[in-house]
Structure formats: structure tokens, C-alpha cells
């Protein structure tokens, strides 16, 4: 409105045959607003200012990445087992080797963004600044089943939520002097990641020294705290006891 007040909004519905029927479709809205402050009367006549815009947005994006096309296929495996007291009494049976979570649905990345655009001195000085909070809910993760389930496969399930927060900025200076021109930029980002929750009270997910645990970054490196390194044989002998 009046080149000062800006708003955009979208809604989309996506479908993926990778999900079971009940979770196949997801609806993902997004909205963005902006305020071109430099168009206000109290800033419009400031000669050195070219742009000053405050903007904010919130949107939801769905993801089915990492899901195999055959996720809904149940696999049956043939195994041999001894029944009774006679070790030679071997019976062949069929077991369900792949357990499926028929409640699978879309991951949802919900992001809030607050930003500022600034240009001055005939567009030579520029600044772009963003603060964001991105929460990913219903994260698809493989879970380990107990051995009594008979399954050797770790099925996918929507069990976790994680959050990323941080800032991004880009400061630039552009100069033209006849046939000579140059651009200078200073770019910076920060990122803080942590697991917000895991459903079903599951234990931490371990992959070697990398552990995913509520309250800590995804796949954080865990290990013993080191007090020091032995420098010579004498120190080893003195601390052997």
C-alpha cells in the first residue's frame, strides 16, 4: 500500500506417495510483511538515505527427504529355529523383518525471520541483517526396536523436534571511480542448534562419539574430559597407582 506497507501471503498443499494414506498431504502457509520506512514523510527527504526497510516473515515448509520410495512395503524373512528339546528339530518360519509406522507424515520446518535492509550514500553503503528462529517438528528419525519384535530394521518415525536460532548479516561498500570499481563485503552468521524434544521417552541416539540428546546440538561430539597428556615415562610411572 502506497509503496510503504507490504504484505505477501501464500498457502500450498503438497502430496507425497512416500507417506501412508493418512499422512500423504500437508498444507504449508507463509506470510511476509514489510515497512519501507524511507518512504515516510519524516525520512523521505533525508538526502543520504536511499533505503530503510523493516521486514518480517513466518512460513512453514514440508519435507519428505530421506524417505525411501518403498517405505510402505513390509518385508518377510525366512528364518530357522529349534523348537523343543531336540536340537535337530529345526523348523522354518516366516517373520516380519520390516516394521512400518503407518502414522508417518510430513516434517515441518517453521521459520520466523526479522530483518532490516539499509542503503545509503547513493547506494554505496549497504546493510542486510536477519534474525531467525527455525523450528523443525515431526523430524523423521530411525528408531531401534527391541529384539523381541523380530525386526532387524530400524523404522522411520516422526519423533523429534529441533530448533536453530541465529543471525546473518552482510555489510557492503561499492565504489565507482571512472573505469575503476571495487566492492567490499563483510559477511557473518551465527547458529545455535539444539534438540527440543524426543517423543516416546527414547534414550539418546548414538552414532559412535556423536550423540543426539534433548537440550544439546544434533549429533554433538561426546567424549571423556582430558586432564592432560603424558609427556614422559617418569610421569607415567608416578601416576601408575
Where are these regions (language model features)?
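Short, intrinsically disordered, charge-balanced linker/junction segments flanking boundaries
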Residues: 3, 236-241
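Aromatic-residue-lined binding/catalytic grooves and analogous aromatic/hydrophobic interfacial grooves
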Residues: 171, 231-232
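Extracellular/periplasmic, surface-exposed regions of secreted and cell-surface proteins
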Residues: 1-225
